[in-house]
């Protein structure tokens, strides 16, 4: 019988950074409704019990941007993103989740 995992790691909240910028817009300027489905990737990934939610979100975002921009589409390696973001955080030997900021930095530096 398979053992149930007892830990509940997932997304790790980002720490505030002096370079953070906040985007605010008046509510009246926002569209009432937008349709995003046309640009969504067709494959839905199941990360199972792996705590790689930030890597999956980043990989899906990359695919979305490529489809929307009518660029050559590829499936970014979610495991590579997960590994490199944990390497930045010093947790490569743990299934510890990661900060989305580190995932984005890792894609910028290492690729996907």
Q: Predicted regions span which residues?
A:
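Catalytic-core signature of thiol
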Residues: 1-112
